[in-house]
């Protein structure tokens, strides 16, 4: 009894191994064609579709879908070979970002460089440091240009403003009468 079970198991295992090898060969054939860059002919594609049910189920069992690489191209799933060709033929992929910088398209990296080299408005503290601002407040006081703060203090401390001049004009008129 034990011997016949063992033989059945061995036979079943052998069938499974053979089915896996045949499935591997069928998957490897199209990949070799893809590497050389050739398209499969219509006859080959039709032959793939006419696969026996046993083959399909065994392929699923061993983790391979019945759709092979050649049919993946037809149904729009990308194989590794296609990804590299996408980069070549100008569809945007993450790899191209470095080349975008090279060919002068603006990337986030370049924006920070623009700030560094003064193409974008720098913040005021940097502008004062590099002497680019019109004039900072301390030097404005020195050069006698009025800031809003100075005007209010002038009124407070009795320096001439428009109101003060008007009052003095009225007094002068009264004195002359």
UniProtKB/Swiss-Prot annotation:
User: Where Leucine amide occurs, residue numbers?
Assistant: 143
Q: Which InterPro entries match?
A: FMRFamid-related_peptide-like, FMRFamide-related_np
Q: Tell me the domain of life.
A: Eukaryota
Tissue/organ expression: Expressed in the ASI sensory neurons, the ALA interneuron and the AVG interneuron from where secretion occurs. Expression in the ASI neurons is necessary and sufficient to maintain serotonin-induced fat loss.
Q: Which residues form the propeptide?
A: 20-49, 161-177
Which GO terms fall under molecular function for this chain's record?
neuropeptide receptor binding
Write the protein's name.
FMRFamide-like neuropeptides 7
Single biological process term from Gene Ontology: neuropeptide signaling pathway
List the keywords (alphabetical): Amidation, Cleavage on pair of basic residues, Neuropeptide, Repeat, Secreted, Signal
Q: What happens when the gene is disrupted?
A: Retention of a significantly greater proportion of body fat compared to wild-type following treatment with serotonin, almost complete suppression of the transcriptional induction of the atgl-1 lipase, reduced egg-laying and suppression of octopamine-induced fat loss. No effect on serotonin-induced food intake, reproduction or the enhanced slowing response which is a satiety-like locomotor response to food availability.
User: What does the protein in this record do?
Assistant: FMRFamide-like neuropeptides. Stimulates serotonin-induced fat loss by binding to and activating the npr-22 receptor which leads to induction of the atgl-1 lipase and subsequent fat loss. Together with atfs-1, negatively regulates the expression of the transcription regulator hlh-11, to promote expression of atgl-1, and thus atgl-1-dependent fat oxidation in response to mitochondrial stress. TPMQRSSMVRF-amide: Acts as a ligand for the npr-22 receptor in vitro.
Q: Region labeled Disordered — which residues?
A: 25-106
Source organism per UniProt? Caenorhabditis elegans
Q: What is its main location?
A: secreted
